[in-house]
Amino acid sequence: MVEKKVKYSCIQSLKDAGAPVIIVTLPEEAEAIANACRDNGITVSAFCDNETRKSSKLFCGLEVFHTPTLPKRFPKARFIIAYYNIQECVEQLSALGYDEFYSPLELLENYDVSKYQHRISQSYMKTRISVWKKSHELYFDEAKIYLRSLDVMITTKCSLKCESCANLMQY
């Protein structure tokens, strides 16, 4: 069992004085997370992302840093993981010397999409948040293992003879 380093309860901890708060990665949901932080009195200092092209412009009025460069600018920081793959972010940031991670699930529990004008349509944002929430909820569910995708490779000739089969070795 992998140790869970990400905390579910975040609002009070992030409101308290401490290291800067940074939102990790820039999926469309990051905009909703930034809005929810403002609604809850949490000051976000910046965003970070692994794609250098995203760090060349502002997002939601805040600077975006290339993740590997964070330690130069922020020796200590608290991170809100906006990415669907929480563990991947935690591993990368832990390797950079960080140890304070939060899921924004608590922030988005009562988030009202219709209250804001997003960069994408309201219905699409609502759907994105719904799917995103499921991946974060599964991270905290001890009874389940979350796999975002699963590749199946058939290595022998299939004998099912399905009518609409796309397998190259069908029959």
PLM region descriptions:
Residues P20, K76, D141, S149-V152:
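A general structural-boundary detector
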Residues I129-L147:
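Short, charged low-complexity linear segments at domain edges
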Residues K144-Y171:
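Canonical Radical SAM [4Fe-4S] cluster-binding loop centered on the CxxxCxxC motif
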